[in-house]
């Protein structure tokens, strides 16, 4: 799996493809499925590379979307305004509950799963309907020298993290003016009109 922050370029790209989408919702939605990883590790002694319900379509479209909405509406404006000194009232407006925000949170969750899907030796995307070990990521298969899925996963993981990291650097360079507003809200602070 790409490191959680490296799911950001997909959220940013979606917001550029459709300007009506809500960037904070896409960001939070693209990060939320990985919330289960430390929880599984800390409370259930499950390996750090394991996933569960939030990495399935069933979980992402229900629990993941609900958590994403709650975090985007109630936590994101507070944290980003505290850390980056954004105008809290503008952030609350950008992060208010709307059908577009809900859809953006849902899309963020789905695209997290799709990015993970291509580079894992198993996928819970169709859980509980299909055995996760019957779904092998295309990059894992491409790089599985001699059928070694672990080697395929290692190469796919490194390659995916590298590519997403390069996209992240490109996004930062492209948005260096008003960087934080551009990459966290999607608009320059003075472009927000309410």
Question: Model segments located where?
Answer:
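N-terminal membrane-targeting hydrophobic helices
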Residues: 1-194
């Amino acid at each position: 799996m790409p490191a959680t922050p490296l799911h950001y370029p997909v959220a940013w790209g979606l917001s550029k493809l459709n300007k009506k989408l809500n960037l904070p919702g896409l960001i939070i939605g693209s990060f939320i499925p990985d919330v289960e990883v430390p929880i599984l590790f800390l409370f259930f002694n499950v390996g750090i590379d394991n996933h569960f319900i939030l990495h399935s379509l069933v979980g992402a479209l229900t629990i993941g979307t609900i958590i994403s909405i709650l975090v985007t509406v109630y936590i994101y404006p507070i944290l980003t305004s505290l850390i980056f000194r954004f105008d809290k009232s503008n952030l609350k407006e950008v992060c208010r509950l709307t059908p577009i925000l809900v859809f953006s949170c849902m899309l963020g969750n789905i695209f997290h799963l799709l990015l993970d899907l291509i580079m894992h030796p198993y996928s819970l995307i169709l859980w509980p309907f299909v055995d996760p070990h019957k779904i092998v990521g295309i990059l894992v298969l491409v790089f599985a020298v001699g059928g070694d899925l672990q080697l395929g996963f290692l190469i796919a993981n490194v390659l995916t993290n590298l590519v997403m990291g390069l996209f992240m650097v490109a996004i930062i360079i492209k948005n260096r003016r008003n960087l934080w507003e551009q990459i966290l809200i999607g608009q320059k602070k003075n472009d927000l009109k309410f």
